[in-house]
Curated annotation (Swiss-Prot):
One of its GO terms (cellular component) is endoplasmic reticulum membrane. The keyword Chaperone applies. It comes from the Eukaryota. GO terms for biological process: innate immune response; respiratory burst after phagocytosis. The keyword Electron transport does not apply. Disulfide bonds: none annotated. Keywords: Chaperone, Endoplasmic reticulum, Immunity, Innate immunity, Membrane, Transmembrane, Transmembrane helix. The gene is cybc1. Functions as a chaperone necessary for a stable expression of the CYBA and CYBB subunits of the cytochrome b-245 heterodimer. It is a single-pass membrane protein. Belongs to the CYBC1 family. This is Cytochrome b-245 chaperone 1 homolog. The chain crosses the membrane at residues 20-42.
Amino acid sequence: MYMQVESRTGTLLHLKRNPSIRSWSLLVGISSVGLAAAYYSTDTWLWKLFYVAGCAFVALQNLEDWEEAIFDKKSGKAILITYSLYKKLLTLCKGGQEQVVVLLKEIRDVNVEEERVRYFGSGYVIVLRFVTGISHPLTQSAVLGARSDVEAVAKELTKFLEFDLVGSRPQAVEESNDSESDEALDTQ
């Protein structure tokens, strides 16, 4: 699952993503190797502690982040929040949370892009495009396989931001301007 809709009202869209089952499986698998090495080794307790701590450290590095996206029309802001357990432990609970705040009026488009994921093929991620030309992914990691899940979230976000209505309006204006200019050329 790419992102789940936590809550949706006329003025608020709250999306949330938790670490995937693959991420939790890697955490358990790598931690199990450390525990097995400590249990079956004949080394001192200090080395056994090193085995467990080292594998736990590597396992936490592979754990995906918790991510939230809050789009609020009342405040006119989009807040993208990322929580990382690994960073929180490294900074002794002082860090681990990154936050990006942008104005909703600066978001120009919402796209689904394919991203290469090392060793696993390709994944999909939603990218927010801003009027300044900058692009920012909605989440830090791509989801493998199911493009339809990502497209469903992108469609929900597009509908909430009313890009489907806004996108058709300028095109209609351009068409009317083209027909007016064609009529002006015909009269000359």
